[in-house]
Structure formats: C-alpha cells, structure tokens
Swiss-Prot record:
LRR repeats lie at residues 82-103, 106-127, 130-151, 154-175, 178-199, 201-222, 410-431, 434-455, 458-479, 482-503, 506-527, 529-550. Residues 365-407 form the LRRNT domain. Suppresses neurite outgrowth. This is SLIT and NTRK-like protein 5. Residues 317-358, 623-642, 789-844 are annotated as: Disordered. The lineage of its organism: Eukaryota, Metazoa, Chordata, Craniata, Vertebrata. Residues 796-811 have a biased composition (Pro residues). It comes from the Eukaryota. The keyword RNA-binding does not apply. Pfam families: LRR_8 (PF13855).
Length: 957
C-alpha cells in the first residue's frame, strides 16, 4: 500500500529558515568576538590579558595594576601601545633596580605610590623618556640622591610626599629642566640645600608638614621666581632676624601665591602668630634690620597668572616687652601707606601647563572650581589646596559683620581687623561653618552674644585681641570644640567665670596678657592641655597652686612677668611651683613689687623662710630627674603643695635654693651627708663615754679626798703590845690591851673641813647642822644609828678608875669603864656620840662599818670662841685654848672580824656621820715612834688667814 508524505506547509518552512538564520548569526558573533580578542591581545600585549585590566580612551591606554600584590616588575610586561598610564600603586615593590623601565618608553604617567620602596638605584628610570608625571608618595624613601632621577628629562610633576626624606642632595633635581610641580609635604626635611632649584622652573611647591625653621633667600628663594603656589604650613618657623628675607620675598610675590600661613613657633612672644602679621621690628628687635632684608627685586611675573600687589593681612601684634613697655592698646600694623589695593582674580591653571592631561592625579592637589562670591568691601582669593576662600576685610571701616554682602561662600579665613565692630551677634557666622581662622583683632568689641560662635565647629584660631571685652563666660566659646589658639590680649578683662574654657578642650595656646585680671577661678584650666600660657601685664598679686597652677601639667612656656606680685606668705606655694619648672619654661623672671624690702627682686632669689617667717608647714614633692624633660601632653607628676582652704600655702618647709639639681650632685651630696653623720655620731658617742668615765673618776676621787682630808691613822695592836703601823684601811684582827690615847689638834689647819654654806644634796655628809639635826636625816629611816649628847654623858656617874698597862701622859688617860659604855652607847664623842651606821637587822653582815672614817670629827670648844658676840660675820670654827682643855675618849669601836655590828638604841637618835663639823677632839692610835711628834703639835694654833683661805677654798668646792 503506498503512503505519501504530508505536504510541507508555509509556516513550517518559515520556522526552519528562521532557526537556521539564528544559528548563523550566533556563529558569526562568536567568531567576531574571538577574532576581536585575539586582535586586542596582539595589540595591547599580555599585560592586559592576564594581569591588569586595560582601558583605552582618547588614544591613551590606562593599565590598572593596582593592589595586585606585585613584588617585582618582572611579573608584568610592558603594554603594546604608544601612550599609556601605568598604575602600580598599592603593591609590594621594595626596590627599583637599574633599567627595570627600559622597555616602558610609552609611559607618560607612572604611579608607584603606597608601596614599600626604600631605595631607587641609579638608572632605575632609564627608558622613561616620555614620562611627564611620577608619583612616589607613601613609601619609605629617606634620601634623594643626585642621580635618583636620571633619565627623566621631560618630567613635569613629581610627588614624593609622605616619606621619610630627611636629606636632598644639591643636584637631585639638577637634570629636571621641565619640572613645574614638586610635592614634598610630610617628610622630615629640616632644611634645603643651596641652589636646589637653580635650574628648575617650579611653579608649585608644597613643603607642608616638615621641620623647616628657615628658608634663606640667597641660593634658594632667589631661584623660585616662577612660583605661583607655595604651601609652607605646619613647620616650626623661627621668627627671628633670619626670617626677614622670607617675609620680604613673600611680600614681593603674588598675594595669592602663598597658600596657608607661615605661623611662628619660636620665640614664645611671637608663637602662634602669622608671619605677615609680625613687623620686622618684632622679628629683629636688637639688630640692624637692613642686614637681613632681601635685596630689591623687580616685579615678578608668571605666565598665565594675573599679579596683584600683596595685600597685607596684618593683625596688630603684641610688641616685645624686651624693648619697651607696650601701651594699653597695641600700635597698628606696618602696612605700607598708599599701597594700591587690587582685587585679585581667581587663579585658573593655564592650558600650556598641560594639567588637563594629568587625569585623576591632579585632583589629588586641586578640586573642581567653586563659585567665587566676595563681599563688596573686601578682597578674596581662592586657596586651591582645599578650595578655601580667604576673605580680607582689613581696615574697611566696617561697623557690623552683617554689612558684608554678598556673603562669602565657604570662607576658610576671614580677616576683619582694624574696623569699628562693637558687637558680635549670633547670626553673623551662620553660613561660615567651614571657617578655620577668624581674626577680629583691634576692633571695638565690647559685647559678644551667647553662642555667637556656635556654628564654627571647625574653627582652630580665634583672634579677639585689642578689643574692650570685660568678662569671659562659658557661653562665649560655646561650639568651639576644635579651637586650638585663642588670643585675648589687650582687652579690659577683669573676670573669668568658672568653667569658661570647658567648651574648648583642644585649646593649646591662650594669650591673656595685658588685661586687668586679679584672680583666676579654681579649676579654670581643668581638662585642658595648655602648652603656652601668657598672663603678662595683669594685676595678679599671687596665684594659688591648688586648682590653678597644678592643672598646667603640659606647659612648654608660661609668661608671668609684669604683675604686682606680693611676696609674702601667699606666694610661697607659687614660688616652689616655679622653682620646679624646667629651664626655658618660664619666660622672664617673676619680680616682686611688694613689700618694699623685696621690691624689684627676683622671686626665685628670695628664700622661702624670708617670704613667710611665721610659716607652719609646706610639703613639696621634689621632681624626679625624668621631669627635667620637656613636658608632654599627658598628665605629669605635679608638685604636691599642702595648702590651706584659701588655696594659698599654709607655710613653709625648707627653702630650695635652685630650680633644678643634677642627679649626680644630689647623690654625692646625700653620700657626704651620710658619711658626716656617721662620724659625728661616733664622736658624740666617744665624748659621752669619756665624760661618763670622768664623772665616775671625779666621784671616786672626791670621796677619797673627803676621807683622806683627815690624816687619821688607825692601828690595832695584838696582845702583848706588839707594835705595828696603823693604816686607814687596815683590818681589825683582834682586841688587845688598851693603848695610850693622844689628844692632838688637826695637825694642820688645812686638814679640817669648814662648815658648809649650803646644802649640796640630801646626802647626810653634805647637810648642814643648823636646825633640827634629826630632821636632816629623815631619809635614812632604813638605817639604825644612836646618838647621845654631852649633857647625857655628864649625868652618868664616872666609872671606877682602871690602871693601864702603860702610863700615858695626863692628857691621854682613858676613862674607866669606857669599853662598857661603848657597848651600850656606841661611839660617843664629847659633843655627840654617833653610833656606827649599821644595816637593817635582816641584812646583818660581818663586814665592819665602812663609814667609820667619818666619825670622831673635832668638836668646838664651848669656852673659846673666835667670833665676837653679836657679830654679823659668819661663824668660824672654834679652836681649843689649850691642849689641856680636851678630854679624850675613843670614838670608834673595835670588833673582831666575826662580830656583828649592833643596832642603835632607837630610831630617834641622830643618824649622821659628822663630816662638816668644827674642829674638836680627834682620837687616834699613834704608834710609838710618832708619840713625841704628835705631842709637840698639841700646842700649835692655826693662823687666822690660813683658816679663812681654807674656808674660801672649800666654799668654792
């Protein structure tokens, strides 16, 4: 059976043709793309295929190899394009070797920023004949050698900022005859070599953020005659005589050429002031200015720029007090009279510099232009670096800030000095939020409305000097959280309220000199890191340490000169605080004005105890040697001064003689003091010991002299009358037969002791016999003695006579029964019979009485007196009229060694061993050989003068 195919319809045929056409189109597109890619790779090179994206625009290829981790240039190959920009920033290149760019002849811009390049070897840029811009910013370069940039003869733009460059060799830019823009900001340059720019046609130079203090005219500035933009900010400029040439040169170039300010860092009297505000007399007050001035120059011109005469943006400066005493209001600025003012036009880069071809890199330094609106009465210029507008309205007789029309757009700096402004209102700066500097000096401002600066959050410098402000309050500075420099000198300020500076925590410089301040509130500087404070020329008599001076922990310089300081107790704490400041911190000496004795005297030179004689105690902690360093902004150790409730010192400890003492001297001094103390202590110890020994020796010798002054000898003979010489210290062996007794005078008048003139002590041997003798010995209640008087003896019957073994002379007869009476009455003398001083019954000792030598002292005769009756003369000792007037009896008791001393008859008896009694009977036991000699001396009477001399001698003793 035959089956035929179904007929093909028109619709199906159309569908097939469309499908086939789509396949062909897709195949063609793929083929074209492949061919195109192959052609691109073949045209741009491998760098655009594998490593980096490439983009061609306006006949220029941009090769973006940024942040690819490239360590060496061997990892990439040069693109195959006539002109290209090679961007290699953000990689890891550390060194550039010779001839590494020899095949990159088409490069016109080379970005090598943000790598870690430390060295560029000679010939590294060979082959870059067409390079016009080179970026080496944010690397680690330290040196630019003479041959660093060899091969870059056509270079126009060089950026090497944010490195560590401290040295530039003199010919480093000598071959760069086309260089116009040089950016060297934020390095470590402290100076530039002479003739560095001699063959370089620079028009833009950025030297911000280095360590430059001077820029000489000869050899440097004289070769920069084509500069149209210069940036010198953030350098520690030394505003001295050497900077006069820079000031003259800046005045000779275009007013708009200087971008930013040249702010003085030193000296302190000019710190924080712009160079164009400082007169030459202030820069060089003691030398001839003409020696430092720049030589006259012809007006300079720069292609493509309209030049105007420099407008002086002067602010009346505080004159140096070292030359003359400044008036109440400072003089006007030193702007040259009749100097024409020409309003400068905004600067636009000329086309012949080729900036339009620099691409995005030119935006690194400049931005798109902004509308320029300037008040009619002022002159303005645009600061290209930050597109800030500088508005100069100096000396325009402006009475109100509201008169400035039209309002300037985004002003960065406004100079309104030398006008007639009296009030600053809240609405005056509503549209100036980006303001960095506001100069209102030398007006007539007497009132500033609360929060008038509330919208100026970016303001860093505020000049209110030379006005009529009388009071400062916290509301005045509200909103100025970024303020760093505040100038309030030459006003009428009498009062500063507590917390005035709380809204300005970043304040570093405060000038309050030449006002009428008498006191500062407690805590006025709390929370601040002030580096420089000027209080010169006020009415301070003292400043408390607590709450004021102790909060100034970061000071670099402070000026307290020209105040009527009252050098009394109130300034003791301040003086001690000043003495602990480091050298150079205090500007000029603090001079006393009162009291009169200290007038015109340096406070440091006066000892603290002289300032405050009636001091109590002031405790000051001495700074450690590390505090000699320049204070930082962190809180350092502050002097601890103990003060009273008023904040003034309570008194004084020890005055310090110097503001600082080297550590070595301090250690040596302490060592010497320690050694001296040891020697002094040893000497005192030896002296005390010698005195103690001497006292003991004197006491012993005195006792010996008291005993030996009675030349008495005692002898005890054994049985049978055996002889032996007696001795005062001889021991008694046994009792023998009675020996003959001899009554003798004292032998010589000097052997008696006169009556004492007074009591020496309570010791009985030094007590007088006047008055009740028994009462004189009441302290000796523990001793037992007995006494009896002559009257008692006379009432007793005489004993029977006893025949002695040897017949003595009549004067030497012993009374019968004497031994028995001695047993009962213990040593009775004609005047008194004093018993032996015996110990207590419970402390009996077989040792004989040690005080036996004090008994038996001579007794005055009752019938012969040498002193007339009724005479006022002192009673002198009595002497016997004849030897026969004496009756002898033994006045001591001899006992065997084994016998004990017996107690006395009662406690009421006299208990006194007589020492200072008048001469009386002396009972001795002479030996046989001395008997005749002793007998011969019985008839000797002493001379009266000898007696008187002896009494005087003992009175002195």
């Amino acid at each position: 059976m035959h089956v035929c195919c179904p007929p093909v319809t028109l619709e199906q045929d159309l569908h097939r043709k469309m499908h086939s056409w789509m396949l062909q189109t897709l195949a063609f597109a793929v083929t074209s793309l492949v061919l195109s890619c192959a052609e691109t790779i073949d045209y741009y090179g491998e760098i655009c295929d594998n490593a980096c994206p490439c983009e061609e625009k306006d006949g220029i290829l941009t090769v973006s190899c940024e942040n690819r981790g490239i360590i060496s240039l061997s990892e990439i190959s040069p693109p195959r394009f006539p002109i290209y920009h090679l961007l290699l920033s953000g990689n890891l290149l550390s060194r550039l070797y010779p001839n590494e760019f020899v095949n990159y002849t088409g490069a016109s811009i080379l970005h090598l920023g943000s790598n870690v390049i430390q060295d560029i070897e000679t010939g590294a840029f060979h082959g870059l004949r067409g390079l016009r811009r080179l970026h080496l910013n944010n690397n680690k370069l330290e040196l630019l050698r003479d041959d660093t940039f060899l091969g870059l003869e056509n270079l126009e733009y060089l950026q090497v900022d944010y490195n560590y460059i401290s040295v530039i060799e003199p010919n480093a830019f000598g071959k760069l005859h086309m260089l116009q823009v040089l950016i060297l900001n934020d390095n470590l340059l402290s100076g530039l070599p002479n003739n560095l720019f001699r063959f370089v046609p620079l028009t833009h130079l950025d030297l911000r953020g280095n360590r430059l203090k001077l820029l000489p005219y000869v050899g440097l500035l004289q070769h920069m005659d084509k500069v149209v933009e210069l940036q010198l900010e953030e350098n520690p400029w030394n505003c001295s005589c050497e900077l006069i040439s820079l000031k003259d040169w800046l005045d000779s170039i275009s007013y708009s050429a200087l971008v930013g300010d040249v702010v003085c860092e030193t000296p302190f009297r000019l710190h924080g002031r712009d160079l164009d505000e400082v007169s030459k007399q202030e820069l060089c007050p003691r030398k001839l200015i003409s020696d430092y001035e720049m030589r006259p120059q012809t007006p300079l011109s720069t292609t493509g720029y309209l030049h105007t005469t420099p407008a002086s943006v002067n602010s009346v400066a505080t004159s140096s007090s070292a030359v003359y005493k400044p008036p109440l209001k400072p003089p006007k600025g030193t702007r040259q009279p009749n100097k024409p003012r020409v309003r400068p036009t905004s600067r636009q880069p000329s086309k012949d510099l080729g900036y339009s071809n620099y691409g995005p890199s030119i935006a690194y330094q400049t931005k798109s232009p902004v509308p320029l609106e300037c008040p009619t009465a002022c002159t303005c210029n645009l600061q290209i670096s930050d597109l800030g507008l500088n508005v100069n309205c100096q000396e325009r007789k402006i009475e109100s800030i509201a008169e400035l029309q039209p309002k300037p757009y985004n002003p960065k700096k406004m100079y309104l000095t030398e006008n007639y402004i009296t009030v600053v209102r809240r609405t005056d700066f509503l549209e100036a939020t980006g303001l960095d500097l506001l100069h209102l000096g030398n007006n007539r401002i007497s009132m500033i409305q609360d929060r008038a600066f509330g919208d100026l959050g970016n303001l860093r410098r505020l000049y209110l000097n030379g006005n009529r402000i009388e009071r400062l309050s916290p509301e005045l500075f509200y909103g100025l959280q970024s303020l760093q420099y505040l100038f309030l000198q030459y006003n009428l300020i009498r009062e500063i309220q507590a917390g005035t500076f709380d809204p300005v925590p970043n304040l570093q410089l405060l000038f309050l000199n030449n006002n009428q301040l008498q006191a500062m509130p407690s805590g006025v500087f709390s929370g601040l890191t002030l580096l420089r404070l000027n209080l010169r020329g006020n009415s301070f008599t003292s400043l408390p340490v607590s709450g004021v001076l102790d909060q100034l922990t970061s000071l670099i310089q402070i000026d307290l000169h020209d105040n009527p300081w009252d050098c009394t107790c109130d300034v003791v704490g301040m003086k001690l605080w000043i003495e602990q400041l480091k050298v150079g911190v205090l500007v000029d000496e603090v001079i006393c004005k009162a009291p009169k004795k200290f007038a015109e005297t340096y406070m440091r030179s006066i000892k603290s105890e002289l300032l405050c004689p009636d001091y109590s105690d002031v405790v000051v902690s001495t700074p450690t040697p590390s505090s000699i360093q320049v204070p930082s902004r962190t809180n350092a150790a502050t002097p601890a001064v103990r003060l009273n409730s008023t904040g003034t010192p309570a008194g004084l400890g020890a005055g310090t003689g110097a503001s600082s003492v080297p550590l070595s001297v301090l250690i040596l001094s302490l060592l010497l003091v320690f050694i001296m103390s040891v020697f002094v202590a040893a000497g005192l110890f030896v002296l005390v010991m010698k005195r103690r020994k001497k006292n003991q020796s004197d006491h012993t010798s005195t006792n010996n002299s008291d005993v030996s002054s009675f030349n008495m000898q005692y002898s005890v003979y054994g049985g049978g009358g055996g002889g032996g010489g007696g001795h005062p210290h001889a021991h008694v062996h046994h009792r023998g037969p009675a020996l003959p007794k001899v009554k003798t005078p004292a032998g010589h008048v000097y052997e008696y002791i006169p009556h004492p003139l007074g009591h020496m002590c309570k010791n009985p041997i030094y007590r007088s016999r006047e008055g009740n003798s028994v009462e004189d010995y009441k302290d000796l209640h523990e001793l037992k003695v007995t006494y009896s008087s002559n009257h008692h003896l006379q009432q007793q019957p005489p004993p029977p006579p006893q025949q002695p073994q040897q017949q003595p002379p009549p004067q030497m007869q012993m009374q019968p029964g004497e031994e028995e009476r001695r047993e009962s009455h213990h040593l009775r003398s004609p005047a008194y019979s004093v018993s032996t001083i015996e110990p207590r019954e419970d402390l009996l000792s077989p040792v004989q009485d040690a005080d036996r030598f004090y008994r038996g002292i001579l007794e005055p005769d009752k019938h012969c007196s040498t002193t007339p009756a009724g005479s006022s003369l002192p009673e002198y000792p009595k002497f016997p009229c004849s030897p026969a007037a004496y009756t002898f009896s033994p006045n001591y008791d001899l006992r065997r060694p084994h016998q004990y001393l017996h107690p006395g008859a009662g406690e009421s008896r006299l208990r006194e061993p007589v020492l200072y009694s008048p001469p009386g009977a002396v009972f001795v036991e002479p030996n046989r050989n001395e008997y005749l000699e002793l007998k011969a001396k019985l008839n000797v009477e002493p001379d009266y003068l000898e007696v008187l001399e002896k009494q005087t001698t003992f009175s002195q003793f």
